[in-house]
Amino acid sequence: MQLNSTEIAELIKQRIAQFDIKSEARNEGTIVSVSDGIIRIHGLADAMQGEMIELPGNRYALALNLERDSVGAVIMGSYDGLSEGMKVKGTGRILEVPVGRGLLGRVLNTLGQPIDGKGPIDNDGFSPIEVIAPGVIERKSVDQPVQTGLKAIDAMIPIGRGQRELIIGDRQVGKTAIAIDTIINQKDSGIKCVYVAIGQKASTIANVVRKLEEHGALANTIVVVASASEAAALQYLAPYAGCSMGEYFRDRGEDALIIYDDLSKQAVAYRQISLLLRRPPGREAYPGDVFYLHSRLLERAARVNAEYVEKFTNGAVKGQTGSLTALPIIETQAGDVSAFVPTNVISITDGQIFLTSQLFNSGIRPAVDPGISVSRVGGAAQTKIVKKLSGGIRTALAQYRELAAFAQFSSDLDDATRKQLDHGQKVTELMKQKQYSPLSVAHQSLVLFAAEKGYLSDVELNKIVDFEAALLSYANTQHAELMAEINAKADYNDAIVGKLTALLDDFKATQTW
């Protein structure tokens, strides 16, 4: 068969018409330096702030410095095997982490990868780690409580859903203990918890996970870990990753609680990255944007209104508000709350729980200093019964602190002063609480009622703890219905007062103290 020139030309035209090539534009650059977890890249045009940059060996870096002729990026993980001259690619994406209910009960790293050996996670999708916080119009005022189960906090420094309450104090004064007790107390409250461990020893984190599991609270909790041995970039990003996981519940009309343990170590990791990127240092060698580092994170903790939830879920959830409550932890050096990072976070949050070494070492645990601890919005969220009964407790402790200072210089005190000092000592003793033993609203109310109505006046100081234990045991066995009623309604009226009075009178009649 012979083809003439016309047929050949037609065939070529057909082939050309059918030929389809897809042009692919790739943003590539070359590594010009590698040192201390920082790479400088030349030729990576159109890079975004915070963009993921793909490195050889399926590793990633985060673009943080965008300069005229180079990009400074921080490597997320190990930088072994990277060298000058290697090619890198821009991905055009910012960092996203998996979110969803399948994360509950799991231990994850900053990137949302499981590290607990329980297999792959079942996530509902991905969320960017940097999200703009809800606006003023989308928020709702805080008016529902988060019960920590700790008398000293729920009575005097109440926390509401959507609040940011700072836990601040020196090392080894029980900051993490308060956070873990709060998580344990949420196992039946419906509040989902996220615990972000930043720069801690792996053994400490393993102990926390074990305690949560023992008390049945791990199934309700996501644990995000950036341990002390991990790269500074992962420690810096861990709180944002945890926050995105918590926002999943907030945006769907549910309540969540997130604990950042602790933000001092995150600030140190960010300072390290900034200095290596040659950004100008400021006070205490922190970069100028260290306030923004924490403010953009903590502003994402909020109570959002029903309209926001309905719009976010495209009408799937109606008439429900969502909340994300944050308990950031800050470690001070020798009680110095006027340092740079502590003052920043105090000004961002809605109050602080201040723990002191002096109280801790004298056996008052939790070592909460009620004089300088404050909750700026929690009062509106306090349960009715605890709010009514706790007012006198705060006053009694304030008067006791004032009188105790004067009593040191005076030996002859009048009866009224002596009674006030005695009452203050007993209330201080009553505020003590063992770790991993949170109390219900009914139990707290009963203890506060006993203190408020003078039932402790004839109980010796060294028997207060035993008195409390016996009282709660008696209430559980003899007055279980009343305890259940208070837990369900938390009302304070004449009928409840009458029942509580009868309970305490019966208890005092059956036992001598």
From Swiss-Prot:
Topological relation to the membrane, as annotated: Peripheral membrane protein
Signal peptide: none
Entries under PROSITE patterns matching the protein: ATPASE_ALPHA_BETA
GO molecular function, one term: ATP binding
Residues annotated for ATP binding in this entry: 169-176
Subcellular location: Cell inner membrane
Catalytic activities: ATP + H2O + 4 H(+)(in) = ADP + phosphate + 5 H(+)(out)
SUPFAM superfamilies: C-terminal domain of alpha and beta subunits of F1 ATP synthase, N-terminal domain of alpha and beta subunits of F1 ATP synthase, P-loop containing nucleoside triphosphate hydrolases
Primary location class: membrane
GO cellular component terms given for this protein: plasma membrane; proton-transporting ATP synthase complex
Name of a matching Pfam family: ATP-synt_ab_C
Source domain of life: Bacteria
Record CDD domains: ATP-synt_F1_alpha_C, ATP-synt_F1_alpha_N, F1-ATPase_alpha_CD
EC nos: 7.1.2.2
Enzyme kind, highest EC tier: translocase
Entry keyword annotation includes Cell membrane: yes
Family recorded in the similarity comment: Belongs to the ATPase alpha/beta chains family.
PANTHER family, alphabetized: ATP SYNTHASE SUBUNIT ALPHA, MITOCHONDRIAL (PTHR48082:SF2)
Protein name in the entry: ATP synthase subunit alpha
Gene that specifies this protein: atpA
